[in-house]
């Protein structure tokens, strides 16, 4: 059995994960947002949605989501409006919410590029598949 080492791939993966997590959180904190708010903004960027659909997509209860949505609405990042072809009551990004979402997405893309920038497209796909497989193994 291999002895844990700071030079091992697993050690470096853990270290990179912790540092990437901090890097992703930085613009959230700077904008007064909480971890997880970015997931809501990213999901709403596709188009407006109902609270029930958003909660299901994020794997949250509607009650857990409600407080977050109230806070984001108070900060003028989302608005409650009719959405979809049936004009159901729902939520969508405001102009301010869209700007913040775009800034967060750009920051995310920069971190992704720092991770994958030296890899060719084929190697990027292979690396992503290997990480996905590893995550699935750990979830078992």
Language model features with spans:
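Long, contiguous secondary-structure blocks with strong helical propensity
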Residues: 55-75, 126, 136, 140
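N-terminal helix-turn-helix DNA-binding core of bacterial DNA-binding proteins
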Residues: 11, 22-64
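A structural signal for well-ordered alpha-helices, especially hydrophobic packing surfaces
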Residues: 17, 101, 135-138
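Charged, amphipathic alpha-helical coiled-coil/dimerization segments
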Residues: 70-132
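N-terminal leader segment of winged-helix/HTH proteins
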Residues: 1-31, 75-77, 92, 99
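Short, locally clustered residues in the helix-turn-helix/winged-helix DNA-binding domain
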Residues: 14, 42-46, 105, 132
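Recognition helices and adjacent regulatory flanks at domain boundaries
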Residues: 6-7, 14, 23, 60, ...
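C-terminal regulatory/oligomerization modules of transcriptional regulators
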Residues: 1-3, 49, 122-140
């Amino acid at each position: 059995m291999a002895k844990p080492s700071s030079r091992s791939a697993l050690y470096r993966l853990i270290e990179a994960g912790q540092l990437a997590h901090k890097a992703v959180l930085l613009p959230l904190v700077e904008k007064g947002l909480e971890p997880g708010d970015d997931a809501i903004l990213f999901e709403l960027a596709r188009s407006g949605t109902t609270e029930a659909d958003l909660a299901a997509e994020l794997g949250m209860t509607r009650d857990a989501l409600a407080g977050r949505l109230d806070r984001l609405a108070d900060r003028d990042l989302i608005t409650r409006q009719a959405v979809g072809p049936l004009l159901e009551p729902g939520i969508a990004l405001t102009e301010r919410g869209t700007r913040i979402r775009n800034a967060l997405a750009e920051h995310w893309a920069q971190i992704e590029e720092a991770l994958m920038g030296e890899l060719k497209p084929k190697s990027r796909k292979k690396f992503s598949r290997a990480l996905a497989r590893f995550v699935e193994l750990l979830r078992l």
